[in-house]
Amino acid sequence: MSNVLVIAAHPDDEILGCGGTIVNHVRQGDTVHSVILAEGITSRDPKRDREERYDQLSQLAKDAEKANDVLGVHELILDQFPDNRMDQLDRLDIIKVIEQIIDRVKPDIVYTHHIGDVNIDHRRIHEAVITACRPIPGQHLVKQLLFFETVSSTEWMPPQSAPNFIPNWYVDISHSIEAKLKALQSYTSEMREWPHPRSIEGVQVLSEWRGSNIGVHHAEAFILGRNILINENEENQ
C-alpha cells in the first residue's frame, strides 16, 4: 500500500491531470491526499477581491469536496493562494507550505504539474514541489515524482518557450475514465463546452489519444521526474 499526494494549483487540475490514476490508486488500497493551493476564482476580475467572490469561492470549495469524494480521495486540503498570481509570492513561502504537508502526509508518490505550461501558477508549483521533494538524508523520502499535463494549459505553451510535455509514463484508466468524467462534472463553474479542450468531450478525447499511444482505450500520461528504488529489507533494519 502506498501513500499518494497530488499537488495541484487550482480546483479541477487534480482531476484533469490524474483523476483516473487517483481512482486506480484507491481501488488498489492506496491512500490518496489531494492538495489544491490556489483559490481558483479571483483572476477573473481586474483586481483580487475575495469578499466580492465569496459565494463563488464557497461553491467552488464544495465542488472540490464533491469531486474528490467521487474519486475516493482520503483527504482534500484547500489552501487560498491568489489565483494566477503566484508569481507575486516568494517561492520559499510556497515551498514551506508544501514541505509541511509532505512532512505530515509522508507520501511515497507525488503527482504535480509539468513545468512547460502556460499557467504561471502551474509553473511555480512545479518548481516548489521539486524543491520540497529533494532527497535529503534524515528527511522523508518521496520515492516517485510524476508530472501531469493539464488540458487547456499545457498544450498551449509554445515548444520554443519551455520544455514540451513528452510523456514517458502511462497509466491505463480504461476502467476509471467514467469516474474521472463524473468527478469533473462536479466542477460546475470550471468545465466548458466542446470544442474547448477543458470540456467533458475534450478530456475524453485526450484520454483516448493517450490510450492509443499504448494500445488501450483510455490512459493518462506523465513525465517521470524521479524514481527511487529502496531495498525494503534494509529500510526496515
Give a label for each model feature:
Residues N3-P11, I15-D55:
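ATP-dependent adenylation/pyrophosphate-handling site
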